[in-house]
């Protein structure tokens, strides 16, 4: 799930990733060759991990902006903005492989059962569906489009100009199907 370039940098100089965990990665006095060998080892142990040639290709800013509106609507920043409970988006952008992000978003608890991150899409047989609580994200498209939109946001997070005050459903819409009362009160006060 990690980019080799990020892993190499991390092994050279560890930084806090999960700030809410009290255990810290020790700093070893690895030589450049040892770090390269360790990175190559982890890469070899990751089946199907290939160099992401497209990692430096810019993402469509409009799609990344839809992702920003989605994570604002879903209140992802409650955990990810300052890294208190979830990894900051700016760090996720640097360390996570693009192909891994949609798998993680759809299968969060199946992939890592002990994670504190909730599963936002409900598995229904072989398909995923949007829970009523987040009904408004259906305006983005089907579940695959939704998770890929968030993936594009994460990948572009450190390079795109994003407005996290933008909202979903600009075309108007009803709150039927799951907006919580807090969101309704905010709309009435505006």
Where does each model-flagged region fall?
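Conserved N-terminal glycine/acidic-rich loop preference
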Residues: 48-60, 77-90
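Short amphipathic alpha-helical linker/capping segments at the junctions of internal repeats
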Residues: 56-59, 122-125, 167-173
């Amino acid at each position: 799930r990690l980019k080799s370039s990020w892993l190499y940098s991390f092994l050279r100089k560890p930084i806090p990733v999960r700030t809410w965990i009290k255990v810290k990665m020790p700093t070893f006095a690895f030589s450049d060759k040892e770090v390269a060998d360790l990175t190559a080892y982890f890469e070899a142990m990751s089946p199907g991990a290939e160099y992401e040639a497209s990692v430096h290709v810019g993402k469509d800013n409009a799609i990344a902006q839809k992702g920003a509106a989605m994570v604002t609507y879903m209140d992802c920043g409650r955990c990810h903005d300052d890294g208190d409970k979830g990894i900051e988006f700016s760090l996720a952008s640097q360390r996570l492989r693009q192909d891994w992000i949609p798998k993680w978003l759809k299968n969060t608890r199946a992939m890592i059962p002990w994670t504190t991150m909730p599963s936002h899409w409900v598995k229904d047989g072989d398909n995923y569906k949007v829970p009523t609580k987040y009904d408004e994200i259906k305006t983005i498209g089907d579940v695959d489009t939704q998770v890929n939109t968030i993936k594009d946001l994460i990948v572009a997070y450190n390079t795109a100009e994003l407005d996290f005050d933008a909202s979903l459903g600009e075309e108007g819409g009803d709150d039927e199907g799951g907006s919580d009362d807090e969101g309704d009160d905010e709309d009435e006060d505006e």
